[in-house]
Amino acid sequence: VAYIDVVQGTDLWLEYRAPLLSASVAASAAGLKGSYSSRNKCWEEYMGKKKEVTSFMQFGTDHEQDAKHDGEIAIGSLSHDVGIYIHPDHDWLGASPDGKFIGLGLHEIKCRDTEPYAGISPQHMAQIQVQLACAEEVKCVYQSWTPLEQRIWIVEYSPEYWACLFPLLEEFWEFVLSKKKPPQVRPRRVIPVEPTTTLFYEGAHDGIRA
């Protein structure tokens, strides 16, 4: 696995990440239904348009360590910090999961101030599958966290899902390289594959955060 050992959130991390199609924007890049933004908006950001930091994004940044701690208690293992994974066959594709449980898989955290997600959205599923492909892992711990409770799923890598998603990412990246604005995707696309997911935990947090 091609791997860059760098601390997430630092200027160096941003520098290494800038020339990559990141897992976090995979759904938007692919034009998927349920993605955070459109394919055109995603392309504009790669062309230099400043990305807006929403209150939801800031909430996630502010509470990620609390969430990681609660996830570790629920899983019963430490989530180790990671840098950037580069896809072994496609060096333009990268991912920075929120952590990695040794012997179990990657760790992806989503923080909310209302209630945990009831399921895994197309936006997050695309992100997870890209992370797994880049890291050559087969499972990811997906944690939907709120200050009072959480839900945690184990998500498995799906070659069938990847076979549908990857051509869409490759298509988008060609528009980035050529600096040619992509046509709008209407209606938004749907990946006709549901990767295997298992609900691992749901309920209030166990233990007390420091």
Predicted regions and their residues:
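Nucleic-acid nuclease catalytic cores
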Residues: 73-183
